[in-house]
């Protein structure tokens, strides 16, 4: 400390100012590195996570619409309404399978890929149930409606719930 005491006031002030400026430079560098890392993380989220969440939400929405149209088909007694619903169902099925393809480039890891493959398999199993249900559900006033309802609330519902559980994890 005797060296510091022997310095003139101007030199002491210059040394103190130099130390403060050195600390400020170190803090600025640390802040820059921290902000750079944060920027990289934000770009990763914006470029990968947000689009994959949007597509996953689209998958969920499409599958829920598909299920709603199936139930509407089951309760409808109007032949022209049945035709409209069948077209809506076919469109939703195609949209669902197409949206699965749109999700593939957004897959970010092995776990995500495995979950996507399982969800896609569940979607195919679920969609494949509709053919038999449609034939029975279209029988107006017949016993086919009750059999269609059993299938819609049985195996089809099971596949639908499995699909929804996977989509919730995507």
What are these regions (language model features)?
Residues 42-46, 71-87, 97, 101-170:
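Polar/charged, Q/E/K-enriched amphipathic alpha-helical segments with strong coiled-coil propensity
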Residues 1-81, 100, 108-111, 134, ...:
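Hydrophobic membrane-targeting segments
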């Amino acid at each position: 400390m005797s060296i510091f005491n022997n310095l003139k006031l101007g030199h002491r002030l210059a040394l103190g100012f130099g130390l403060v400026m050195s600390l400020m430079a170190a803090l600025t560098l640390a802040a820059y590195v921290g902000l750079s890392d944060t920027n990289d993380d934000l770009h990763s989220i914006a470029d990968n996570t947000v689009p994959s969440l949007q597509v996953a939400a689209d998958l969920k929405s499409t599958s829920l619409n598909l299920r709603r149209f199936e139930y509407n088909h089951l309760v409808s007694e109007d032949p022209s309404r049945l035709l409209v619903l069948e077209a809506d169902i076919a469109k939703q099925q195609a949209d669902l399978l197409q949206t699965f393809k749109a999700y593939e480039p957004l897959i970010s890891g092995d776990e995500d890929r495995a979950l996507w493959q399982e969800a896609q398999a569940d979607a195919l199993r679920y969609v494949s149930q509709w053919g038999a249900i449609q034939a029975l559900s279209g029988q107006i006033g017949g016993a086919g409606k009750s059999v269609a309802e059993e299938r819609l609330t049985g195996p089809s519902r099971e596949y639908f719930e499995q699909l929804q559980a996977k989509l919730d994890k995507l």
